[in-house]
Amino acid sequence: MIKKVKASLSEKIIFIFLITLGIFSLTSFLILKNKCLFVKNYDPKKIKFDNPENIAVLNVSCGNVIIELYPKVSPKSVERFKTLLRSNAYDDSAFHRVIEKKLVQAGDLEFGKKNNLDYGKIGTGKSGLGTINSELGGDFKYTRGSVGLARSFKNNTEDSQFFIILKDEPLFEGEYTPVGKVIYGLEVLEKIKYLRNTEYILRPD
């Protein structure tokens, strides 16, 4: 006669632990495999904007990033940004600089295109339109989501490259030309550093 063996308390605890560990491991794997899993993708066609002419949409792997531009703050810089957007110049432009939890930068139209990357020069390219003068924004506050034009170490060297900050940066105020602020989809940018697709992470800091 076969006797039914009862599991001891310690065996039950081990069994429950292994099951829990398995579920946790599977969940972690699925999340790591798809970093966009919990990121909301905003459809600009379903959002009513007060001034649609001052709205820019960036298409990133995890979804759309919607930016409100501020022509009253930096008129010439915003016009340059709009000109490049209208001509689709930013299409296939890689995020070549990513500082985790601080900022992402893109817009190198000469060396930073995904289909024509130059790893030795990326970040130094131009648009072909020439540089423009800095517009340092007066009382503009560089709070989380603000968008500014990148430049060299000197003022009046802004061109096509832009950055978006992921945290408040008061030290940027009066130093970099602001062009707008992300109003939807900032969480999309926070996922860039973790994507395995290297077209988005070329020289992470």
Language model regions located:
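Cyclophilin-like peptidyl-prolyl cis-trans isomerases
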Residues: 1-205
